[in-house]
Structure formats: structure tokens, C-alpha cells
Amino acid sequence: MYDYIRGVLTYISSSTMVIESQGLGFSIFAPERWLIELSSQLHRELIVYTYTVVRETEHVLYGFHTRGERECFRMLISFSGVGPKTGLAILNTFSLSQLCSIARAEDIKAIASVPGIGKKTAEKLMVDLKQKLADLLPLDAQILASWEPAKPSCMEEGIQALAALGYPKSSAERMIAEAMSELPDHASVAEILPIALKKNLQGLNKI
């Protein structure tokens, strides 16, 4: 299985891209909204994180902008009734941050808004998402921690990241402060965010 493919983007359609690498053209299915973003990147080199689905007659590649998105896709298609097509539709509708927020809020209506997902499937999917929330949060923190703004303090950057996930500022400040109290002074945002999210989830489970 490929972890990623580095190559030149030579073609884009509404559902696929072609990456040329070492003389081979890889046809890769990807979320439509990422493909739209890539429309200005034709003939440029990029890295695509891939997941391979093996069928009887073919191997199908699915591609994502980050490892976190790829792992989220892997998680989604492990759920009953969710195949690759539906998994892509979910990631095309929601970012990983939004999925985390939806799972916390148990927003079944939001899940049911994804093309191809009815109310009953949405209800089942919500149960699965809630059970896997602890796995989703570190993936989302990994993506958020890759931001590189104009070097605010770790606390400020952590608070901004949690605010982007939908946490109120007061909650974000408390979560970051608690996480930082357990880590060395030189801890990075990439280390702080997973601890903050994990501790908050543990607190919710005690309620």
C-alpha cells in the first residue's frame, strides 16, 4: 500500500486527479472541494496521501491533502453501511474539525444532509462517530497544529486552534492551561492540543 505519491498534477475532473510520477500516471479519487482548490495547481508538484481499495478487477486509489484526512476516511469506511463513495461524500461536505464538532453535538441532521445518507443511516453513523471521537480528536489536533501563523505564543495558538473547533474562548483557555500545566515549558502546540482535547473528553465522559 502506498503512503503517499509525490508527483506532478497533470489532470483534474470533478471527482479525480492524475498525478504523474516516475513516468506513470496515477488516477486518484479525491474530495471534490480539494480538487476545486487544486484547479490552480495544474502542472505543479504535490504530495497526495493515498488509500488503496482492492477490488476483484482493479485497485482504486483515494487521495487526501493530509494524513489526518486519510485516516478519517479509513475510519469512516470501517463503519457499517459506509463505503468509499459515501466516505468521500462526508469528507467533501465536512472538514475533520466540523466532524468532531458534529460528533460532540450529536447533530444527526447535519450528517443526514450528506448526499446518499438518510436519517436511519445518519443515526447509526452518529453512534459510530461518538465511539470514535477519541480517535478523531488527535487527528484533528495534528492538522490544526500544522498551522504556522505569525508565531503567537503556544497558549495563544492553542486557544485559536480550539476556537476553530467551536470551543468558546473561556473553555479553550481553560483546556490549554490545564494541558500546559502537565507538560514541560518548551512543549509545542502539537504536543499541547492532543492533551487538551483528551482531558476535555475524559471530563465529558464523567458527566
Swiss-Prot record:
GO molecular function term, any single one: four-way junction helicase activity
Region of interest (Domain I), residue spans: 1-65
Gene3D superfamilies associated with the record: 5' to 3' exonuclease, C-terminal subdomain (1.10.150.20), DNA helicase RuvA subunit, C-terminal domain (1.10.8.10), Nucleic acid-binding proteins (2.40.50.140)
Top-rank lineage group of the source organism: Bacteria
Protein name: Holliday junction branch migration complex subunit RuvA
Main location: cytoplasm
Role description: The RuvA-RuvB-RuvC complex processes Holliday junction (HJ) DNA during genetic recombination and DNA repair, while the RuvA-RuvB complex plays an important role in the rescue of blocked DNA replication forks via replication fork reversal (RFR). RuvA specifically binds to HJ cruciform DNA, conferring on it an open structure. The RuvB hexamer acts as an ATP-dependent pump, pulling dsDNA into and through the RuvAB complex. HJ branch migration allows RuvC to scan DNA until it finds its consensus sequence, where it cleaves and resolves the cruciform DNA.
Subunit: Homotetramer. Forms an RuvA(8)-RuvB(12)-Holliday junction (HJ) complex. HJ DNA is sandwiched between 2 RuvA tetramers; dsDNA enters through RuvA and exits via RuvB. An RuvB hexamer assembles on each DNA strand where it exits the tetramer. Each RuvB hexamer is contacted by two RuvA subunits (via domain III) on 2 adjacent RuvB subunits; this complex drives branch migration. In the full resolvosome a probable DNA-RuvA(4)-RuvB(12)-RuvC(2) complex forms which resolves the HJ.
Gene: ruvA
Cellular component per GO, a single term: Holliday junction helicase complex
Any single biological process term in GO: DNA recombination
Domain notes from UniProt: Has three domains with a flexible linker between the domains II and III and assumes an 'L' shape. Domain III is highly mobile and contacts RuvB.
Region of interest (Domain III), ranges: 155-207
Family affiliation: Belongs to the RuvA family.
NCBIfam families the UniProt entry points to: ruvA
Record's subcellular location: Cytoplasm
